[in-house]
Amino acid sequence: NYKITKKILHVHEILPNTFFLHKIINKIALKYSHALICVSKAVLQNMEEASPQYRSKLHLVHNGISFAKCIEVHNDFLKVDTHLINFGLIGRIKPIQKGQNLLLQALCLLPKDILERAHFYLVGSPVKGQEYMQDELLENIEKMGLKKYVTIIPFIKEIESVYANIDVSLVPSTLADSFPTTILESMYFKKMVIGTRIGGIPEMIIDGVTGFIVDKNSPLELSEKISYCVIHPDEVISKGIQGKIYFDKYFSIDCFNERYMACINKLL
């Protein structure tokens, strides 16, 4: 019977309550569900803000990710200069939301000698119909004199080949991201992460241990952390290793399944 069946929602996205329609959707989800399992504290807090009276329905289970398939790395997909520190920003070409613009602003603040020791790969494609965003990004790279240091690579399915060839993963989101899969992938592949203090990102990075967390409105802070990575390549490696340890302990698919089923059993 539908009426006596418990309705449990798994909430992956942050629909900002500042938008009327988003708030209505959040309120309906809270009112008509028995429970909502949220993938991050950021998601949970956003839902709570919509209807605080339903706080008891909200539960936190951090997401996990599986790499059960056989991973075959193809180095031909991305050829890098191994004498440099190679940074990768993997995600849709959405310069404001995904932080490509923030990164370019940060690069303009780097001393020339630091820039010469690094390269930055923007891996991803624009949404169909929004190709102008990539055109504008390319134009900005040219105007800022960064063409030598920044390469845009269209999205590829063999994303593991990108991780195999970069040293640092950049997640400089400027709009709330619930629990970026990119960070989980980065940790799995032993890459340290520099991410912004927004959405679920701070819940995924141990600042100073597995990577760095920077302010989403501070190109200067991002540039300082990039510079630190270039100057301290040994720490880039060690932070990546710590990230893998952290991933195995908290974000593997087995850990996720255990947490998720424990939550479900508690709710039944």
Predicted regions and their residues:
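Acidic donor-binding loop of glycosyltransferase active sites
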Residues: 164-178, 191-192
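Short, structured helix-loop element that forms part of the nucleotide-activated donor/catalytic region
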Residues: 119-147, 235
